[in-house]
C-alpha cells in the first residue's frame, strides 16, 4: 500500500488505465481523439486524459485517502488506433455519474473538456462523441417543445419548414427591417430570422425591431391564413437583459425567439429554454462560434457533441450545416448528428461518426436548420438529404431575387412544394431534381427568374473535417 504514497510524480496509467473495466449503464462515456507528444505511450496518454478530466492531479495527495477513488475516478477502458494516422488513437473514457451536477451542461463540459485540453503530455486532443446515459439526460428539461409540438403549434405538416435570414445583417433601421420581414413572410416563407449578430445596436435597438417584426408577422398572417414567425434574437450582454427581451417577445404574442447558445453560454441558454417552455415560446438556436471549437480535425470538440449538449440544454431548432452550400459538412457525418438531434434512439455507427449508441428516452427532438449559401437549385438535394423534419433557410437565396424579397420567397416556396410533391409521387429527387425544378418554373415566373440567377453558383472546396 505504501507504494502509492512515494513522493513525486506518478504514472497515471497505474490508476486510470483499466482495460478490464465493464462500463455501467449510468456511466457517461467519452471518445477522445488523442495525439500524444513523441515518446508518450497511448495507455499513459489515455489514462492522463481520464485522470485530468475527473479526480486526478499530478502528484499523490493525502486527501486521496479520505475518499473512494474507485467510486469517483474516470477510467480509460479502451484504446484503438485511427486508420491511416500513426500518431493518433481513440481513447474511450468512462466517467461515474456522480462526478456531474444534475441538469447542468455547464458542469458537464467544465469537467470533461475544462482543463485537460492544455495538457503538456498531449500534442492535441479532440472530443469526438459523448454517450449521455438516461440517468443523466433525465435530469434535463431538454428542448422547450420539440418537433411534434412545433408542427401542431404552427399547423404545418408533411414538408420541411422554410426560413430566411434578413440581410444586410447589420445597418437596416427597424422599420425597413420589419418591411423585409413582411415581404418574405407574405411571399410564402414560414419564418424569417434575425442574424446571429443582430442584438441591440445603435442603428436598431432591440425593442424597436421586436415591435416592427411583430407587426409584420400579424399582417402576413392575416393575408395568407398561415401561421408565421420571426426568430427574434434575445441574445444579450447579461442574462437579465436576455430574459427581459424574451418577456417582451411573449407580451407581443410572437411564436418564436432565438439565442446564440455558444457565445451566450450554456447557463444562459438553459434558463432561456425553461422560460420558453413555461411560456409557450419556440426557441431557435444559432451556433455562432462553433467552428472555433469544432473545425480542426485533431483538436477541440466535434459538433455532434455540441449538438447533444444543446438537446439537453434546450432548443427547438439548431443550425446544422447544409452538405451543399457555402459552409462545410460531410454528408454522412452531418446526417449522423442530424439524427442525434431528431431521433429517440440512435445506433452506434462509426461510418457516420457515431461512437456510441444514444438513447434519449423520449426527450423531445430538435429540428436541424440548413442554412448558408443555398438557393432554389439546391432544393431537391436538401429535401432528399434532410427530409420533412428540418428548416431550410435561404437568406441571399431569397433576398437576392432580381424582382425583390416577396418574389424570392415565392420562388423558394414553389420549389419546395414541387420537390415534396415529386417525392410523394415516388420520383427520385437525387436523379431528377433539376428536372423537377425546371418543370415547376414553367408555372412560376418567380421561380424561373430565380433559376436563371443562380444557375451556375457553387461553393466547391474540399471538406476539412473528413473521417
Swiss-Prot record:
The EC number(s) this enzyme carries: 4.1.1.39
Compartment annotation: Plastid, Chloroplast
Chain sites annotated for binding Mg(2+): 193, 195-196
Residue positions of the active site: 167, 286
Site (Transition state stabilizer): 326
Role: RuBisCO catalyzes two reactions: the carboxylation of D-ribulose 1,5-bisphosphate, the primary event in carbon dioxide fixation, as well as the oxidative fragmentation of the pentose substrate in the photorespiration process. Both reactions occur simultaneously and in competition at the same active site.
NCBIfam families, per the entry: PRK04208.1
Protein name, as recorded: Ribulose bisphosphate carboxylase large chain
Lineage: Eukaryota, Viridiplantae, Streptophyta, Embryophyta, Tracheophyta
Protein's gene: rbcL
